[in-house]
Amino acid sequence: MSTVASIIVSIAEEMRTASERGTVANYIPPLARVDLNRFGMAVVGMDGETHTVGDAEVPFSVQSVSKVFSLSMALNAMGDELWGRVRQEPSGSAFNSIVQLENEHGIPRNPFINAGAIVIADILVSRYGRENAQTRLLEFLRPLVSDPSSIDIDTDVARQERETGFRNMALANYMRTFGNIRNVVEDTLDFYFHQCALTMSCHQLAQVGTCLMTGGRNPLTGERIMSERNAQTILALMMMCGHYDGSGAFAIRVGLPGKSGVGGGILAIAPGVASIAVWSPGLNAQGNSLLGTRALERLVQHTGWSVFRANPWVANPT
């Protein structure tokens, strides 16, 4: 067993016996029914070597982790023009806060809070149309994984999010009054809810993340998926904003760019080294996976992969 493999097996055992597990997202009915004891982890290296443990092959709702992918598509489509409609700064507020929008005239602080991701969804609907945007999203993701047909959108989750997503409706309509939502609000939100209802496993999520690990290339084919500059921008935003008002604590504890979702998933990237996905559905007070964060903290402690180390990629896992 390789060192990384033995490390994540040890981590999974620690998480299995943890007494504090967090709380599932009970405001989205399908997520409220997920077993709190689920735990999976996957690590994919630059050479394609893959290590998985626990429920790493079980599909789950990636929710806000999907914002990394929609942002990648929007940056490919618009480039820096995008930053006229959404900023690049941490919010320091809850992911669904409306307060800052009023103070900042309908321009969201960053593309990972809900308001910012809704603007990104609006951009993609403008470019591709509501239905075709969903197809384009799947076409963007599927070439990056070894079993592409199993990445899909759970339409039941999307429907129930639409039926209960009153705060997101308020955010979209409020931004519409400032001209920052340019399509029919219902069309933009329909794509946004379907985007968040993406399902994939930890293994697949780690595979998708490899295009950020490699600076924008598909490691399976060598094809460039995005520019190196865009990949660096996304990683910087993941570090600053990927865990909402818990982003600073995550940066200190883990020290890797990461993006969480209320489905309990986290995608973390060690640039040039590894793409890591972890899933544990219990959330902390900020809406981030409690045990997922702890598992990544343990991984970095063992491997030395924090970007804040003096020589982060020199230390070998021990």
Curated annotation (Swiss-Prot):
Record-listed E.C. numbers: 3.5.1.2
SUPFAM superfamilies: beta-lactamase/transpeptidase-like (SSF56601)
Residues at which substrate binds: S64, N114, E161, N168, Y192, Y244, V262
Stretches assigned to coiled coil: none
A single GO molecular function term of this UniProt record: glutaminase activity
Reaction it catalyzes: L-glutamine + H2O = L-glutamate + NH4(+)
Keywords: Hydrolase
Pfam families the record matches: Glutaminase (PF04960)
PANTHER family per UniProt: GLUTAMINASE
Family stated for the protein in its record: Belongs to the glutaminase family.
Subunit structure: Homotetramer.
Protein name: Glutaminase
Gene that encodes the chain: glsA
